């Protein structure tokens, strides 16, 4: 089932997405999010996560950086904490906030 879903997502990216234009308010895009979710969490859970993400992606959504939970990108977006303090704050680094402009 996983290869079929990945193939359908690839077909969407190649055949339909160029004609529909970029409308996603999130980074990674919803189709990239769906691909990552299926790869990292399997067909059933990944499909559910992708469906929930599609429901969050609408014209009134704030958008922004929203990686798939449990992936390497998510780990860098949400640093581990130690004794209630961020590892980055403990090392003297300023927190990084990513804001994307609204289209």
UniProtKB/Swiss-Prot annotation:
One of its GO terms (cellular component) is plasma membrane. It is a peripheral membrane protein. The keyword tRNA-binding does not apply. It holds the Pfam family YidD. Keywords: Cell inner membrane, Cell membrane, Membrane. SMART domains: Haemolytic. It is found in: Cell inner membrane. It comes from the Bacteria. Residues 68-91 are annotated as: Disordered. Belongs to the UPF0161 family. Could be involved in insertion of integral membrane proteins into the membrane. This is Putative membrane protein insertion efficiency factor. The lineage of its organism: Bacteria, Pseudomonadati, Pseudomonadota, Betaproteobacteria, Burkholderiales.
């Amino acid at each position: 089932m996983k290869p079929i879903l990945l193939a359908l997502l690839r077909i969407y990216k190649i055949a339909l997405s160029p004609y529909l234009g970029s409308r996603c308010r999130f980074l990674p895009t919803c189709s990239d999010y769906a691909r990552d979710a299926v790869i990292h969490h399997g067909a059933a859970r990944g499909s559910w996560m992708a469906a929930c993400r599609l429901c969050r992606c609408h014209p009134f959504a704030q958008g922004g950086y929203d990686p798939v939970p449990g992936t390497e990108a998510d780990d860098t977006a949400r640093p581990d904490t130690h004794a209630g303090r961020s590892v980055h704050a403990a090392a003297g680094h300023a927190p990084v906030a990513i804001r994307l402009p609204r289209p």
